[in-house]
Regions:
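Anionic N-terminal interaction surfaces
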Residues: 1-42, 120
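Generic signal for short, ordered secondary-structure residues
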Residues: 20, 26-27, 47-48, 85, ...
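Phosphoinositide-binding peripheral membrane targeting modules
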Residues: 32-83, 92
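Generic hydrophobic/packing signal
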Residues: 72-75, 88-90, 110, 114
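Canonical phosphoinositide-binding patch of PH/PH-like domains
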Residues: 88-109
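C-terminal partner/receptor-binding element of secreted or periplasmic proteins
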Residues: 104-116, 120
Length: 120
């Protein structure tokens, strides 16, 4: 599923040489209803993106780095996995549960991009 989603993201031109991405589960409101989704969080030069495409759901939501406060890392005690918390300037937040060890690299890259936008 992970590889398929990356291939689909590539066809939508969401990935480039400087893209960082991570796969996991998160809750998102679709048509006013909260849904547990499994998809990609993508960080490229232009935007931070939630992406999911399957037979049931298509989600492509882009966020400007200027609207993001920070991407935090924590450990989920319940699931014993890492979680990333994307916090926006308007106090909205999203949490992604990730199973792989790439959370550190992904969070560092995203926070570098947020800081770069702040300094510009």
């Amino acid at each position: 599923m992970y590889e398929t989603m990356i291939a689909k993201a590539s066809t939508h031109e969401l990935l480039d040489m400087n893209t960082s991405l991570i796969y996991g589960s998160f809750t998102y409101s679709v048509e006013g209803e909260l849904m547990d989704l499994t998809g990609l969080w993508i960080s490229n030069e232009d935007a931070f993106i939630f992406y999911l495409e399957n037979e049931y759901v298509y989600l492509l939501k882009k966020f400007a780095y200027k609207d993001i406060e920070v991407l935090e890392q924590k450990i989920s005690i319940m699931s014993m996995t890492k979680k990333l918390i994307l916090r926006f300037n308007n106090k909205e937040s999203y949490t992604l549960l990730v199973a792989n060890g790439e959370a550190n690299v992904f969070a560092s890259r995203v926070n570098e991009r947020i800081e770069k936008v702040r300094l510009d």
